[in-house]
Amino acid sequence: NIAKELLKAGYEPALFGYTDTSLDPRDVPKGDKRLTTYENVLPGFKRIAFTGSDNEKGDWHGYLEKKGYDKIPTTAYAIDEQDLNSSTYFQQEFLPPSLYKEEDSDTAFLTQEAIQYIKKNKNQPWSVFLNYLSPHPPFVVSDPFHTMYNYKSVPNPIRSESIDQEAKQHPYLKYCLSNKRDGENWYFNDGSYAANMEDRQLKKINATYFGMMS
């Protein structure tokens, strides 16, 4: 456990962002609800600026509320959820931008918080674990990054001629192609399978992903 090792060495393990950690069942009471998720914070880290999880709002949400955003959701990732289904979502030339401005993104928020922490603690031992979510589903990014790359210039995805042929490559791939639905990663509401997405749709997702990287 790197956080506990840092504590032994005299450092405060400061967390900015999140850690996806499955807790050791030997260390928590039987039936603890934290055992049902891998989105826990690694024991030993001190949460300085937490972006939240599926079950918990984070410091970023409080920041957005203070900035006057009026559509703050109850979970970390729902901030990027679009109230659209997949059939209308892809009819636009570019996927919609995020609800928040570039300067208010979780990336910008964490960066500023980490800089302030380092400045405050520069004369004493310190350690910073700064973990950005982006680029990562859900695939949405703030203006102007959502229009930075046109999907028409994105290469076509490499696919087999049919889903059945694709599935023959590996049993796990067969499972994913049969069970992975859009909503698990892209927050669409129609329950369709990701494997059935058109090349054009996937290219628009890739174009948005490139914007997230930028």
What residue ranges belong to the model's regions?
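Catalytic-site neighborhoods of secreted/periplasmic enzymes
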Residues: 1-100
